[in-house]
Amino acid sequence: MIIHPKVRGFICTTTHPLGCERNVLEQIAATRARGVRNDGPKKVLVIGASSGYGLASRITAAFGFGADTLGVFFEKPGTASKAGTAGWYNSAAFDKHAKAAGLYSKSINGDAFSDAARAQVIELIKTEMGGQVDLVVYSLASPVRKLPGSGEVKRSALKPIGQTYTATAIDTNKDTIIQASIEPASAQEIEETITVMGGQDWELWIDALEGAGVLADGARSVAFSYIGTEITWPIYWHGALGKAKVDLDRTAQRLNARLAKHGGGANVAVLKSVVTQASAAIPVMPLYISMVYKIMKEKGLHEGTIEQLDRLFRERLYRQDGQPAEVDEQNRLRLDDWELRDDVQDACKALWPQVTTENLFELTDYAGYKHEFLKLFGFGRTDVDYDADVATDVAFDCIELA
């Protein structure tokens, strides 16, 4: 079928299979350009592997270090008559090109919060991956979590705490500057956000993997977080989501103590602001990202997801000089270091009050933001003919959990 973008709110309801594949190829090329090393992870599990930082982790592990990878995600497959989600096509493209490079690649499509997903992962590690993994990447960003056992459903809330937050934002449907107000989260919403986006599920994964004996000696685990700056703190770090990320930090300390007994470790990696399906949903982020992209591009500091993950693997987790990774006082790996430079943030603060609907495209990189957003769904690429027919029914080596 012929597929063009249809954007509603912060979601594009259509996806382009070929565009998604080209995006993955672009990330593979960026990784390969930095050279392939053989002194890093060999067997990698990525939980939340189909888009954003999770996908970039999988690409970096496979094409930067020659690792075998197992990816878990929750996506909709395409059929002959309907396109699937972007994450499905990203994962299909990854699988195709990893196999072409002679690398082991297997995927599981299902609820990554479920015990069934953990059981399936453990079975595959035992039967197909040599029995153990040496890196576990935890990269789930979900609005909903169904608790294993009880089946109770918890929902996360993108809300401030204590008082209504009002700030300048972009109406991304109309490309206009508006005042956005968000009501504060209730105590229950804060609690549920911690349950969905905190460290509980990460710990359940490590419990299960360790209990089954499928974690290698020296195995590491990393989970992703975002702290941001005072511009975004009210809605993020000081909001319900921030409380969940504090829980993630506490979980990392516990897991690190456990894994360190066998020569490994666990860290939270704090990453920079990038255009992802997760960040597009957070009010104020599109405007902040549009500003910080412009400033960082001008300073030669800009990074996308794959550049961030390359730096995380090559300069933090698996340093060639054999030294331990540089961490902050909470044992976090900081990849938001360039974004948080004083010169970058001072420029952002000076720019923020000046932005209007009329000068939005001129003062910020909102055009770049829109382009990156469409790219998430396979659109906006110059090397794809969007008026040509494309097959939407793309199958690959993926186990479907019932």
From Swiss-Prot:
Outcome of mutating Y236F = Loss of reductase activity. It is not able to restore fatty acid synthesis in the E.coli fabI mutant
What outcome is documented for mutating V246A in this protein? Same reductase activity as the wild-type. Restores fatty acid synthesis in the E.coli fabI mutant
Q: Does the keyword Isomerase apply?
A: no
Q: Is NAD included in the keywords of this UniProt record?
A: yes
The pathway entry for this protein reads as: Lipid metabolism; fatty acid biosynthesis
Q: Where does substrate bind?
A: Y226
Outline what the protein does.
Involved in the final reduction of the elongation cycle of fatty acid synthesis (FAS II). Catalyzes the reduction of a carbon-carbon double bond in an enoyl moiety that is covalently linked to an acyl carrier protein (ACP). It can also use crotonyl-CoA.
User: What does changing Y226F do?
Assistant: 50-fold decrease of catalytic efficiency. Restores fatty acid synthesis in the E.coli fabI mutant
Q: What is the lineage of its organism?
A: Bacteria, Pseudomonadati, Pseudomonadota, Gammaproteobacteria, Lysobacterales
Domain of life assignment: Bacteria
- Reported effect, T276A: Loss of reductase activity. Restores fatty acid synthesis in the E.coli fabI mutant
Spell out the PANTHER family in the cross-references: ENOYL-[ACYL-CARRIER-PROTEIN] REDUCTASE [NADH]
The protein in question is named Enoyl-[acyl-carrier-protein] reductase [NADH]
The reaction(s) this protein catalyses = a 2,3-saturated acyl-[ACP] + NAD(+) = a (2E)-enoyl-[ACP] + NADH + H(+); a 2,3-saturated acyl-CoA + NAD(+) = a (2E)-enoyl-CoA + NADH + H(+)
- Known outcome of mutating Y53F: 50-fold decrease of catalytic efficiency. Restores fatty acid synthesis in the E.coli fabI mutant
Q: Which residues bind NAD(+)?
A: 48-53, 74-75, 111-112, 140-141, 245, 274-276
- HAMAP family per UniProt: FabV_reductase
Q: Which residues form the active site?
A: Y236
Instruction: Give the recorded effect for D111A.
Output: Loss of reductase activity. It is not able to restore fatty acid synthesis in the E.coli fabI mutant
Q: Which molecular function terms from Gene Ontology are attached?
A: enoyl-[acyl-carrier-protein] reductase (NADH) activity; NAD binding; trans-2-enoyl-CoA reductase (NADH) activity
EC number from the UniProt entry = 1.3.1.9, 1.3.1.44
Q: Which organism does this sequence originate in?
A: Xanthomonas oryzae pv. oryzae (strain MAFF 311018)
What family, per the record? Belongs to the TER reductase family.
Q: Where is this site: Plays an important role in discriminating NADH against NADPH?
A: E75
For this entry, list what GO says about its biological process.
Answer: fatty acid biosynthetic process
Ordered alphabetically, the record's keywords are: Fatty acid biosynthesis, Fatty acid metabolism, Lipid biosynthesis, Lipid metabolism, NAD, Oxidoreductase
